[in-house]
Amino acid sequence: MGLQHAFAMVGGLIVPPYVVMRFAVGGDADMQQYAIACSLILSGIFTILNCVQFNIPGTKYVFGTGILSVLGTSFGFLPIYESAIAAMRAEENADGTDKYSGKEAYGKMLGTTMVCAMLEVLLSFVPKDKLRRMFPNIVTGVAVMLIGAGLTATGIKYWGGGAVCAEMAWKNNGQVYGLVGKGGTWFGPAQTGVAPFPGGGGRSMCDGNGEVIKAFGSPEYIALGFSVVLMLVIVELFGSPFMKNANVIIALLFGYFVAGVSRAEGNKFVPDTKIKSAEPITFAWVENFPIGFYGPAVLPLLIAFLVTTVETIGDLHATYEASEEDTESEEFDKSVQGGLLSDGVCSFAAALATGMPNTTFSQNNGVIALTKCASRRAGVCCGLWLVALGVLSKVSGIISSMPDCVVGGMTTFLFCNVFVSGLSVVSKADLNSRRNRIILAISMGVGLGVTAVPWIFGDQRGSPGTAPFWACSGPFREGADCNKGERGIRDGILILLTTPYSIGTLLAMTLHAILPTDMEVVGYSADGGKA
């Protein structure tokens, strides 16, 4: 049973570290392998601790859930890590050199995560009913949907060949460049002497697919990604219950196999260099990152921990129901308190061990429902399997050698699943309510808008045709530069505005706090009569 739970988790565990390390250090195979191994090891250790509940001496509080509830690296923090690391990597010293290396940027995010994780620790001592009132389904659902929407865009970029070359392809061959190519002008006749959209129509080549280097969106990349989706459908049609619960890892391995036997102009999609170079065993702390603090990421991270707090309560409720336990009992309240404390402490410990924040995984509730086994021993065995898979770094070598397009086919499915989960949460709210519809429309409108057009608040495409949201140098400030404090405030606001679920969740929380109930809007008093 433990292995079955581990298989249900592995696909989701490897994606966040894989994507973040691609952002931070590019194609460094050793760093990718380490990050994946670290995610598996830490998730295994924390799952064991979470399943085995501990009393805190001298208090009425506990640590851990005491049920079959697993912990894993959270998708919710991925967009913030991407945005913050990208912002730090874009900073330069006076001589034009990079201010932060990828490892330094990641280290700063780890330090900031340690500080922000204390919020969830504090919230673990707040009664769950108060948390539910503060963050109802309409707010939590918006947050989860926008996490999924933003990440799905990242998944599609990987499916087409890679996230970096996708950005360059859009920059060089975007819709506006098409206008220029047809005889249009960038600025119009009033602006002269300004070069048209940069890039000159050159192709953006993707280098994250083994020895194969082709333009973004090449048919070979699309086909390999589609092989993963095809296997997902086949498993759902013909697979056993066990296979359906392990559909992510089965489809990923199938796509990996297809890529392994495929060639493009004699070049391999899966060379064995990364597997051969991987050490036999590894563990956390093998790699070091200079721990720091990045102020601009604080508010987005705090919002993320608020969201995971409410998600954890919902996940534990689902676990109790799948385990056929009473959700109105004192034991459930104790599990919620211990689970939230476990989430916060383990996220702190994960950052201390160079990993990303952890939270409860909901997909394992399906395994419980199908197998009718809710024993904590299965959770402990699951944790041991995850640790074993992480320690055997050849496993990480195999995973890191997967072509970006194969990973993209899987992550598009996984990330959109997050969106669907949020949709399920929102559906529990009264969507006939005028108040809820306004909250949903405004927060989702802005959040999805930022997902579709992220450069509205910042010149992320590097084009001469968009104004920087808050310029720190250049013609919009007539050569003036921001001081350190102003730049920090600017970067913090920019990360908040360009991370879809941060701005969307903040709007939903604000509207929930200030909008009157429908009864008050239409002029009825609380006892049902006209006011």
Question: What do these predicted ranges mean?
Answer:
Residues M1-L13, K214-V228, N245-N247, G260-A264, ...:
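Hydrophobic, membrane-embedded alpha-helices of multi-pass small-molecule transporters
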Residues M1-L68, F75-A84, M88-K99:
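N-terminal signal-anchor module of multipass membrane proteins
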Residues G2-A6, G66, M109, T113, ...:
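Hydrophobic alpha-helical transmembrane segments of multi-pass small-molecule transporters/permeases
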Residues M21-G64, P300-R376:
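Membrane-embedded helical hairpins/re-entrant loop segments and their flanking transmembrane helices
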Residues D30-A37, T59-F77, R133-T140, M243-I249, ...:
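Short, non-helical or kinked segments that cap or interrupt transmembrane helices
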Residues F46-T47, F75, T185-P189, G193-D207, ...:
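P-loop potassium selectivity filter motif centered on the GYG triad
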Residues A84-E91, D98-E265, C381-G529:
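Membrane-embedded alpha-helical modules
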Residues F238-L253, I275-F293, A297-L301, G314-L341, ...:
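Hydrophobic, small-residue-rich membrane helices and short re-entrant helix-turn-helix hairpins
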